[in-house]
Amino acid sequence: MKRSAYHEPVLAAQVTDFLVLRPGIYIDGTLGGGGHALAIMRALETAGFEKNSLLIGIDQDDEALHAASTTLSWYKETTVLVKGNFSDVRSILGKVCKQRGLVSRAAGILLDLGVSSSQIDTAGRGFSYLQKGPLDMRMDRCSSTTAADIVNTLDEKELAGLFFRYGEEPRSRMIARHIVNYREQTGAVTGTEVLAAIIRNAERDPHKQIKTLSRVFQALRIEVNQELEVLKQALSDGVDCLDYHGRMAVISYHSLEDRIVKSFFVEKSKSDWGPKGVGMREPLHKGVLGLVTRKPLIADEKEIQENPRARSAKLRVVENVATGGSHAE
């Protein structure tokens, strides 16, 4: 598969192998530059499903949508690109299907979580401690709250809680104290390089600095974009949008995301057999999901060498085994 110049798709072969099984509506809820969407469309074409299928690509980043429109130009008749958040997957699917006279049920949904390589490499987005830029970190540039707002307004206790909760940072209190001291003595934390210097000053061990920087920047990014709340909403509504035997594939990159995804999938796969000792022959409620992958799929060494971002990626896939369900509106 030809690589996208904007975003190198992670685990693309596994995604298409487990997701593209029949014609229908496919949703890439985290479109990015269109790398995974292109892989899905090519898989549909190879299987002879393309003319009876539609791909809906969702992203809140205008630059990503522009890049994806170029990547998917060959398939413009069978793709619809929508600016939005993947937590709105139900309403977006409903609107697109209503416009086209289609039943609003998806054969497959993909969520590739985290920040794209392009966003990390663009200094002006403020996602990376390796790039000198503003403390922004907004996925959607139309949203109001930036990382600078959080760093410069939260008190020490709130900052420490944030870094520990979303970054699992063991030195969260020390880092928060250094940030507040800097604000009191110097003024506002104005950019990524200033924040990185404060963090390095709090964590003097050079062998630990990179992981500490990564955890703090991750925590801020999650808070700015409300990523975990958005993920929970997207998982819940996404499952409701699946057709019978439709599948959802989710790629996560850190333990907080993966725990949420795993917990949700496992819980939705369980059947309710009522109180212990009753000995019911049929469950009160059957699980709505089947676990296609009992354990997460990971990249092999070849892919990791070609695309280091794949090293931390975990792919989980489930299938809707419930014949009923609510349609998207």
UniProtKB/Swiss-Prot annotation:
Domain of life of the organism encoding this protein: Bacteria
Which SUPFAM superfamilies would you find in this protein's record? Answer: Putative methyltransferase TM0872, insert domain, S-adenosyl-L-methionine-dependent methyltransferases
Q: Tell me which EC number(s) this protein carries.
A: 2.1.1.199
Catalysis performed (reactions): cytidine(1402) in 16S rRNA + S-adenosyl-L-methionine = N(4)-methylcytidine(1402) in 16S rRNA + S-adenosyl-L-homocysteine + H(+)
What is one GO biological process annotated to this record?
rRNA base methylation
Keywords linked to the UniProt accession: Cytoplasm, Methyltransferase, rRNA processing, S-adenosyl-L-methionine, Transferase
> Where is it localised?
Cytoplasm
Q: Name one GO molecular function term.
A: rRNA (cytosine-N4-)-methyltransferase activity
Enumerate the residues binding S-adenosyl-L-methionine: 34-36, 59, 86, 112, 119
Gene Ontology CC terms = cytoplasm
Per the record's keyword annotation, is Nucleotide-binding included, yes or no?
Answer: no
Q: Which Pfam families match?
A: Methyltransf_5 (PF01795)
* Enzyme class at the top of the EC tree: transferase
Q: State its role.
A: Specifically methylates the N4 position of cytidine in position 1402 (C1402) of 16S rRNA.
Q: What's this protein's family per the entry? A: Belongs to the methyltransferase superfamily. RsmH family.
HAMAP family from the UniProt entry: 16SrRNA_methyltr_H (MF_01007)
Name of the protein in question: Ribosomal RNA small subunit methyltransferase H
Protein species of origin: Chlorobium phaeobacteroides (strain DSM 266 / SMG 266 / 2430)
